[in-house]
């Protein structure tokens, strides 16, 4: 009001939005809803966080553990697309900016979500277990040649151990399921190698 009274123009304010939890409420340290940057960096790469922040900078963002896998998969998809794009399209790809014009050229062989599923189904507590599964389907893939994937295995284990394993529930089989499982074990033992 004062600026208008003296005939001057209002200064441009700094536009920013808050971070929201999964319910769309403001993140609060006292409530513990949402995740911190340090937690994100335990579960995913700094580049995935940069990409998450880069997209829609003026819009409020939900920042909770459930967005991490999707953000990582979005990042991996953009890296994969980058190699196939024309030069002018590459400049429009956010990973060009996230990596200061030099995105990695590593072949993306599986999503972070798939690694989380592998970690969950195998109860993996180290990356060697995950690499055994990866190598079943991609024999030519080696950790030292696939830095992104190797880092993702560590992130997947951290995320699984902290966020998924505590919520994991095991169903006790009923009588019919016990019979079926017992029959399956017998059949598997009888298969000749």
Where is each model-derived feature located?
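Secondary-structure transition/capping motifs at alpha-helix termini
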Residues: 4-11
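Glycine-centered secondary-structure boundary/capping sites
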Residues: 7, 138, 161-163, 169, ...
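Catalytic adenosine-cofactor/nucleotide-binding cores of aminoacyl-tRNA synthetases and other
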Residues: 16-163
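Long, compositionally biased, intrinsically disordered segments
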Residues: 133-137, 167-174
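C-terminal non-catalytic accessory extensions
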Residues: 160, 164-165, 189-193
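C-terminal accessory/binding modules appended to enzymatic or scaffolding proteins
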Residues: 172-193
């Amino acid at each position: 009001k004062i600026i208008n009274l003296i005939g001057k123009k209002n200064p441009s304010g700094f536009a920013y939005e808050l971070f929201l939890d999964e319910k769309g409420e403001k993140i609060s340290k006292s409530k513990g809803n949402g995740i911190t940057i340090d937690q994100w960096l335990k579960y995913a790469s700094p580049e995935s966080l940069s990409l998450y922040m880069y997209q829609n900078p003026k819009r409020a963002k939900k920042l909770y553990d459930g967005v991490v896998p999707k953000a990582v998969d979005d990042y991996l998809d953009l890296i994969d697309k980058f190699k196939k794009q024309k030069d002018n399209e590459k400049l429009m790809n956010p990973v060009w900016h996230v990596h200061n014009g030099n995105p990695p050229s590593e072949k993306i062989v599986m999503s972070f979500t798939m690694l989380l599923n592998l970690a969950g189904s195998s109860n993996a507590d180290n990356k060697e277990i995950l690499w055994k599964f990866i190598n079943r389907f991609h024999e030519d893939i080696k950790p030292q040649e696939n830095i992104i994937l190797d880092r993702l295995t560590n992130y997947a284990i951290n995320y699984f151990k902290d966020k998924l394993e505590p919520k994991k529930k095991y169903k006790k089989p009923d009588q019919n399921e016990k019979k079926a499982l017992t029959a399956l074990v017998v059949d598997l033992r009888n298969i000749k190698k």
